[in-house]
Structures are given as structure tokens and as C-alpha cells.
Amino acid sequence: MNILITGIHGFVGSNLIMALCEHHTLYGLDIISPEKKGVVRTFLWEDIETTSFPIQRLPHFDAIIHLAGKAHDTKNQSAAQVYFDINTGLTRRIFDFFLESAARKFIFFSSVKAAADSVVGDILRENVIPTPVGPYGESKIAAEDYIKEHFVLSDTFSVNKGKMFSFKEEIVRYSDKQVYILRPCMIHGPGNKGNLNLLYNVVKKGIPWPLGDFENKRSFTSIDNLCYVVEGLLTKDVASGIYHMGDDEALSTNELIALMCEAMGKKPHIWKMNRKMMEGCAGLGTLLHLPLNTERLRKLTENYVVSNEKIKSALGIDRMPVCAADGIRKTIKSFEE
């Protein structure tokens, strides 16, 4: 297949290229266009504008994978509009291009944060009513909404001011196309510099984890499992729709730290400080504007479990190829290199 991938120089893009380049012909679309191993050519965003680069002069693409976007800023220093300009604006541009092109498949990388900032109940599934919090999740759901306004997903309908759109012409026009909205939870793997790397640096210094009394569960996404799912969406006849993505097993922060220490050959230092006492300290931190406050404590200790049953059923598999623990071990060992 000829595949166009946006955001190829990022963490996920680089790993996808390594996973796909052996059996597919890959093209890039990014804000920079240096040569990249495994990529035939990288186009710039202005190249897909028909006014400057007619679509007839571009290669024939069988599929488009849209990765480009602004990641969640954990320091909250980015202006809200930047998220919408990039996460929503670029999605509109590339999806419009997809609809006009001969490409048959479109994979959009959204996020579970487009669905919910916190999980209500035991597990987050695709049928949840989206309630994003903050510009990252809000810009992602806005991008999803744009896609649904212009393409009928098999398990969703689009709504505008309480009225359903009439899609008869579009259904006929785009009946040969398939569109997938992927909502992965936290992705990790070699080359990842996100939150997992921050926790790794704390553990590596031997700093004790004082929140061992909180037994939370969180879902993660191994980059190997993610690449496996993308390959499946590209090569199998999977129905268009929204799919959550995560490893089979959810891990507690205590288990995560233990796995990190195991990979580093260190003994874990997990302190089970009294839960009520830690909640009181966090409350005081809120009043005094200290690093550990009530909101940060909630984020560090809450459950965030994501179901992957729908995507596994769509691909016809019972389990992901990599278990959560093995994926974490591989990531941590890459930090050590």
C-alpha cells in the first residue's frame, strides 16, 4: 500500500515507519521535510493545497494516517488557541484532502482525553458521552466532530443544533472509504519522552513513592500494540468507527514503579503513607499553592481504565500481542540505553 503519514518525525510516527516500511511504501507530511529512513518522500502541508500543488500531481495514496498534533502540555503553558489551530485545524485540512483523494482508508489519532478527563464508573468505553476538560481534549473532540460531520461512521451519527444531517449523497459518494478514529490512552515505547519518562527519572534517583496506600489502576498503550492495531486497520476489512486503544491489563502506580525498578535492577521504595494524612497534606498544598495539591493528588491516584474490547473484536483477536508488563519493561530498558 502507498500510505501518507502526517507527523512522521514524532515518537509515534517514527515507530510506525519502522513497523510499516518493510511491507508498504510510505510518504510523509510534516512541517519539515528532511530525509527519513523508510520514507520515500516527505511533503509539506502547503503541498496538499490544490491551489499550490494539484492533487493529480501527488502520488496515489491508498491510506492516510493522521498523527500530527499538539501533545498535551503537562505544564499548562500553551495557549488554548494553539491546540485548536493544530489539533482541529490540521485535521480539517487533511480530512478534506482525504475525501477528495483516491485514498480508501483514513486513520485519525485522537485521544481518550477527547472522551473523558476522568473515568466515571469502572471502565471507559466508546459509547461514553464525551466530556473533555481543557483545550487538548476539547480540540481533539472538535476534530472528531468535523470528521463525523463529513463522513458517516458505522456506529455514530452527526448532530447539528439537535438535527441529524442528511447524508444520502455523501454515503453514495464515499461508500468505498473507511474512516477510523483511534483514541489511545498513554502511549509509551522507545523514544518516548512523556509522563512515563518523568516518573522514571524520579524512581531512578531513589526517591520514595509516598502514595503506596492508593491502589489505582490505569491503562497504558505499548507502541508495539499500537503499531499492530494500525497494521490491522490497514490490511483488514474493519468497519469505520471510533475505537479506544490500550493494553489488555491495567496497572497500578505501585505495579508500574515495581516494574521500573525490576528493569533497572533496583529495589522499589514504595511508602504507604496514611491515605487520610496525604489527602490532608494535599488540601493544605492547595491553600498554600504547593506542588502537591488536591487536583494533582487526584490525577496521581485516580483510576483510568480503558476498554480495548471493541478494537480486538473488530480485528478478530482475543489478546494484544504484547502484555502491559512486557511493554513497560521494554520502554524502561530503552531509557537505560
Where do the model's predicted regions map?
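N-terminal Rossmann NAD(P)H-binding glycine-rich loop of SDR-like oxidoreductase domains
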Residues: 3-22
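NAD(P)H-binding glycine-rich loop region in Rossmannoid oxidoreductase-like domains
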Residues: 48-86, 97
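Substrate-positioning beta->alpha
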Residues: 192-198, 212-234, 240-241
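Flexible, glycine-rich beta-alpha linker
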Residues: 177-197
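Conserved Rossmann-fold NAD(P)-dependent oxidoreductase catalytic core, especially the SDR/UDP-sugar
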Residues: 93-135, 154
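Mid/C-terminal beta-alpha module of Rossmann-like enzyme folds, strongest
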Residues: 236-292, 324, 329-332, 336
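Conserved C-terminal active-site "lid" loop/helix of NAD(P)H-dependent oxidoreductases
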Residues: 223, 258, 281-318
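Active-site Tyr-X1-5-Lys
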Residues: 134-154, 165-180
